[in-house]
Amino acid sequence: MAELHRKSPVRLDIIVVGAGLSGLATAIATSLSGHHVTVFESAKELHEIGAGLQVTPNATRILKQWELPDRLWASAAEPTSVVVHRYSGRVLAREDNFDKNIRKKYQSPFLDLHRVDLHSALYEKAKELGVEFHLGESVNTIDFEKSEVTCLSGLKGHADLIVAADGLWSRCRACYLNRIDPPLPTGDLAYRVVLELDDITDPELRHWVENPTCHFWIGPYAHAAGYSVRAGKMYNIVLLVPDDLPDGVSKQSGSIMEMKALFEGWDPILTRFLNLVSGVKKWKLMHRDELDSWVNDKANLVFVGDSCHPMLPYLAQGANSAIEDGAVLGHLLGHMKSKDQLPKALRMYETLRKARGEAIVKETFKQRESFHMPDGPEQEARDKIFQSQLEGGKVEGPFPSRWTCPQVQPWLYGYDAYKEVEDAVLESPFPPAETNGGKNGATTSSI
């Protein structure tokens, strides 16, 4: 096994901009590598929003190694099967013993968590490691010449490395590009629903919640996903439909009547769940163009998470990939023997992470295409592939659900961030020292 939590003999000062999942993951991993970490977060209090989160083996193996609080694992739901339904309810494909199969193949579980539970566990771990937090501080400008951030309040922070973990609407990205760079709509939006078991009286629906499984319903231009969280005490549903939010509006309260109308005629189980909804929000799904580089020329700014590779939720890899980013970056920085090796470490990070992150983004768009086919010849051909698995029991070759596709699942779930770093360092060891050369980028950026 790769050596974990390798500590560098040199201690970098690192500023992480953003205390979402990617920021906290990076703060933990870099702190475990022996560096001094300060997080700047615009929110005055860390109240993570969101609902369910599917944490796949490529991330759970990292989280286990970070020794997060036991209560996180106690709050998880581990699905025993994955079922794909035609929107009418007819089963197209299923994998039973999913939990056992996943653990056997990847030596780490597939868990469904509440986003708040994961976020609070990461925050607690970061504080335990001595990470400093400046809450209510919005980074406004970055002086790359001085390696310094300035917040709207006037507070300044100097660091050897600034990590852009400020999400989809990244201010760091605008500073790096020296221009406003808003995210782009994908044409889809999400309705997010969480139901409490205590509010469900229907015996069949209660059974679904109490016995964790993962269900997908796929239909023309839309699909739904449902799974248990909080150890079977809550049920998370996400509905993906064409975007009808106005330009410039990223989220707003939704109409329950409108939401239910979009799924009229779908599986009665799904519509019975939707009849229990008392309030819902609509979230515009956004993406970004690829950056030319995730590291600036001065090697004092690096991107992680949604700031560089936001992902549609169709493979549930946004959070998982962000955790990978943090783990790889932190472990690489643990290999440094001197500060002048920082540029090499960051180049290696980009080599290990950029192509994979951008490839996952492309796979999410392919999954949307496979799940959202309108009725017709292509949909019928897709369903025949699904049915062949249901009848034969074994998936071979390309498969419309990448969650169980033998070509995609091992690539996604089999990824070992720490081993990737160890293999890369073995192939290209860190030299005794390296001069920080290269072209200078912009000195100060204030959009």
Question: What residue spans do the PLM features occupy?
Answer:
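Accessory recognition modules or surfaces
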Residues: 2-15, 46-58
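Residues at the starts of beta-strands that form the adenosine-phosphate
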Residues: 13, 36, 234
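Conserved mid-domain beta->alpha element of the FAD-binding
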Residues: 16-36, 40-43, 163-164, 226, ...
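Short phosphate-binding/catalytic loops that engage adenosine nucleotides
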Residues: 35, 68, 131
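Active-site-adjacent segment of FAD-dependent monooxygenases/related oxidoreductases
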Residues: 51-125, 371
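Conserved FAD-binding catalytic core of PHBH/FMO-like flavoproteins
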Residues: 88-91, 120-278
